[in-house]
Amino acid sequence: MQLKDFDFDLPASLIAQHPIKNRTDSRLLIKRSSIIDIQFNQIGDFFQSGDLLIMNNTKVIPARLFGTKETGGKVEIMIERILDENQVLAMIKASRAPKIGSCIFLENDVNIIVYQKDNGFYTLIFETDSLFDLLNNIGHTPLPPYIKRTNNVQDLSRYQTVYAQKDGAVAAPTAGLHFDDSLLAQLKIQGIDHLFVTLHIGSGTFTPIRTDNIKNHVMHSEIFEISQVTVDRINLTKANGGRIIAVGTTTVRVLESSLKNGKLIAQNGETDIFIYPSYQFRIVDSLITNFHLPKSSLLMLVSAFIGRDKMLELYKHAIEQKYKFLSYGDAMFLEKNNDL
């Protein structure tokens, strides 16, 4: 398939720039025999007792830092991945690239050594005993490039799921932003439980596809984890006829990456899985996801799940009804198309 097959006109006015007041007040598009437009807090009406929600519990770190080179030039650092207790993989924006072996000075007198560069990413060594304390003190929330404003205090909590546990992401698993503790408790009373996987989302999630033939696209790699507890519960749910409902595309990528010889395996690893039309889903039955950019890998995953024509139909409806798109936008709840 060609990249142009996944294009559509997205009015800039529909790209949400701020979160709404209450998480669960966002809008939700549901496709059954017809298109249903409701609020997210009504989603429980479309679940069945015995369904299982799988959520990504990664936690967004304050990954943007500002510093000064030895020459006095200003730099912006965007952390991509934590490597160990004081080393990170990062991108650096500067008028001139920093030299390998040079220092970058942060505002709290912490030095960073520019250790090496590979494939556009720098390995940086922080001269600190507590990297996470440092980031929490002077780091900034790494808002996506399509949010055209500076971050604020509200983003610290709202660009984070209420169930975020494991530090490591530089972008939020945005489908999960619509849940609050009250909704999760209500669903549990209905017999709909939730468990977690982890995928630390990197900045590669925002990288545009540049190949005309989408099959030639090389997907970015991200660290993930799925526990034996989650694997066992998924297997039990399926055996009992319940649905596996993935909250977000990152959860889908973990689940579909964790199969070996047709069996779901607990593991820690990395995945560069690229899901596009013709992919056969083996674990996920239903998907909750936000609205995505034209020609993005996330849009292709949705197209693989429900069919490209159906995706374009739903997106046309969403644009006509002025749904909000992307991270702080609205959501859709989809059933897998088993006829693809």
Swiss-Prot record:
Disulfide bonds: none annotated. InterPro entries: QueA, QueA_dom1, QueA_dom2, QueA_sf. Its main location: cytoplasm. It catalyses: 7-aminomethyl-7-carbaguanosine(34) in tRNA + S-adenosyl-L-methionine = epoxyqueuosine(34) in tRNA + adenine + L-methionine + 2 H(+). The keyword Transferase applies. Its EC number is 2.4.99.17. GO terms for biological process: queuosine biosynthetic process; tRNA wobble guanine modification. Keywords: Cytoplasm, Queuosine biosynthesis, S-adenosyl-L-methionine, Transferase. Pfam families: Queuosine_synth (PF02547). Pathway: tRNA modification; tRNA-queuosine biosynthesis. It is an enzyme of class 2 (transferase). GO terms for molecular function: S-adenosylmethionine:tRNA ribosyltransferase-isomerase activity. It is found in: Cytoplasm. It comes from the Bacteria. GO terms for cellular component: cytoplasm. Monomer. Belongs to the QueA family. Transfers and isomerizes the ribose moiety from AdoMet to the 7-aminomethyl group of 7-deazaguanine (preQ1-tRNA) to give epoxyqueuosine (oQ-tRNA). This is S-adenosylmethionine:tRNA ribosyltransferase-isomerase. It comes from Vesicomyosocius okutanii subsp. Calyptogena okutanii (strain HA). The gene is queA.
